[in-house]
From Swiss-Prot:
It is found in: Virion. GO terms for biological process: regulation of translation; symbiont-mediated suppression of host innate immune response; symbiont-mediated suppression of host PKR/eIFalpha signaling; symbiont-mediated suppression of host type I interferon-mediated signaling pathway; viral life cycle. Belongs to the orthoreovirus sigma-3 protein family. InterPro entries: Reo_capsid_sigma3 (IPR000153), Reovirus_capsid_sigma-3_dom_sf (IPR023634). This is Outer capsid protein sigma-3. Keywords: Capsid protein, Host-virus interaction, Inhibition of host innate immune response by virus, Inhibition of host interferon signaling pathway by virus, Inhibition of host PKR by virus, Interferon antiviral system evasion, Metal-binding, Outer capsid protein, RNA-binding, Transcription, Transcription regulation, Translation regulation, Viral immunoevasion, Virion, Zinc, Zinc-finger. Cleaved during virus the endosomal proteolytic disassembly of the outer capsid. One of its GO terms (molecular function) is structural molecule activity. Stimulates translation by blocking the activation of the dsRNA-dependent protein kinase EIF2AK2/PKR, thereby inhibiting the host interferon response. Sigma3 prevents the activation of EIF2AK2 by competing with the kinase for dsRNA-binding. The viral outer shell polypeptides, of which sigma-3 is one, impose structural constraints that prevent elongation of nascent transcripts by the RNA-dependent RNA polymerase lambda-3. A zinc finger (CCHC-type) spans 51-73. One of its GO terms (cellular component) is viral outer capsid. The gene is S4.
Amino acid sequence: MEVCLPNGHQIVDLINNAFEGRVSIYSAQEGWDKTISAQPDMMVCGGAVVCMHCLGVVGSLQRKLKHLPHHRCNQQIRHQDYVDVQFADRVTAHWKRGMLSFVAQMHAMMNDVSPEDLDRVRTEGGSLVELNWLQVDPNSMFRSIHSSWTDPLQVVDDLDTKLDQYWTALNLMIDSSDLVPNFMMRDPSHAFNGVRLEGDARQTQFSRTFDSRSSLEWGVMVYDYSELEHDPSKGRAYRKELVTPARDFGHFGLSHYSRATTPILGKMPAVFSGMLTGNCKMYPFIKGTAKLKTVRKLVDSVNHAWGVEKIRYALGPGGMTGWYDRTMQQAPIVLTPAALTMFSDTTKFGDLDYPVMIGDPMILG
């Protein structure tokens, strides 16, 4: 399972896309380069060399640093300073069992897809497989609002191993078939870059439709591709629903939260960084004025190159400033059994009004 770090890759991809790969990036494994696959450590921004872990200035562009210098940085905090975000065992167990039921069934359905059906969806769009919530394990908390953390748990041997195997296999199936699931977005920027637009509509002219329950609070974006805009001048419309941490799954920090690999089960984040093991590491926040100034430069340059609307769609409300506030300035909080009292009584674990699907949203003609 991935270690919980601020998503440097996401920001590097964003900047590289905006500047067409002309931004110099540094990694310990590969040194300075314009295209890097390893964990990024430094990048050039606004005449300065910036640490990708804390967005602090570590030198000037002319200096061309050969390694990431030591500075007050989240990446260089001692191991004993890490904070464990620990989830109560029963909560983790419920999540895992519900998720296993879901991914195992979706995996089985994908296995039964014929090449003819796959070709049809690729050319005509639409849904390839659908899983109705009623098919999920009836003992799962995701089935009904009446389920609770204290409901009996089904015993599953090697639960972690099975969940990891099914989850990995399902991801490989989706990737190899070049399909789009409506229950996760591996990279939020794919809402633009991974979906083809009709006509000559510019990506920055994306039309959007919002669910009436949405708010400006940041949360998980669930994209439903079933509603499409056919006007070529407007591009494609999405119905978006926001799942907010305070309202839907308790008040705890989101700097450990990975939007990029998060499937949603009935408005609950079923799997995210560290979730399969029940805990993840979070770095304490260290604030610095140089870092804040650098962020402003970064925001201005990327907004200018990519457009505010596209940035906002890729990184959520608040754009890059909001992303920075959420990932870099989030105080570590431990979720304990006592903290479960913050879970709302009205949380609905399986009350989605549409099934989860895997398919291609593109419709020709």
